[in-house]
Swiss-Prot record:
Keywords: RNA-binding, Stress response. This is RNA-binding protein Hfq. One of its GO terms (cellular component) is cytosol. It comes from Desulfitobacterium hafniense (strain DSM 10664 / DCB-2). The keyword Magnesium does not apply. InterPro entries: Hfq, LSM_dom_sf, Sm. Homohexamer. Residues 10-70 form the Sm domain. RNA chaperone that binds small regulatory RNA (sRNAs) and mRNAs to facilitate mRNA translational regulation in response to envelope stress, environmental stress and changes in metabolite concentrations. Also binds with high specificity to tRNAs.
């Protein structure tokens, strides 16, 4: 059986979303957004801060920095088991 390759971007975003972990998103223009990731797809990320939501296009994102380190090994194993 072929294992599907791990999608690091989706695994990372899904883990911070599930853990309600605050993140700082740095945009390519230098602007910073802080908040919680509420959802994402192939092209966008929805972030919430102080009850307001913003949809940000991924091509505008430079860096996503979580408040704490993410255990990507455990996260990728659990996402593989969910398939």
């Amino acid at each position: 059986m072929n294992k599907a390759p791990i999608n690091l971007q989706d695994t990372f975003l899904n883990q911070v979303r599930k853990e309600n972990m605050p993140v700082t998103i740095y945009l390519v223009n230098g602007f910073q957004l802080k908040g919680l990731v509420r959802g994402f797809d192939n092209f966008t990320v929805v972030i919430e801060f102080e009850g307001k939501q913003q949809m940000v296009y991924k091509h505008a994102i430079s860096t996503v920095m979580p408040l704490r380190p993410i255990n990507l090994v455990a996260a990728s194993q659990s996402s593989t088991e969910e398939r």
